[in-house]
């Protein structure tokens, strides 16, 4: 089963903490749903890159960690 973090309705200021906690407390595979916001996608990928986590963009607005 894939763990999912849905960021719809979350504030940009909270994304760093939410994504960091999610990726550090769960094991792959995981999905992070960012929606249509390019800012949200950038915030998420910044956290993943900071932690050297490999990710793929499967659909616009969804990032997968395998």
Predicted segments, located by residue:
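Long, charged, low-complexity intrinsically disordered regions
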Residues: 1-66
């Amino acid at each position: 089963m894939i763990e999912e973090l849905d960021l719809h309705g979350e504030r940009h200021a909270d994304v760093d903490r939410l994504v960091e906690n999610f990726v550090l407390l769960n094991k792959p595979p995981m999905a992070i749903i960012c929606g249509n916001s390019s800012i949200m996608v950038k915030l998420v990928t910044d956290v993943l890159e900071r932690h050297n986590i490999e990710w793929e963009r499967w659909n616009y607005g969804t990032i997968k960690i395998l």
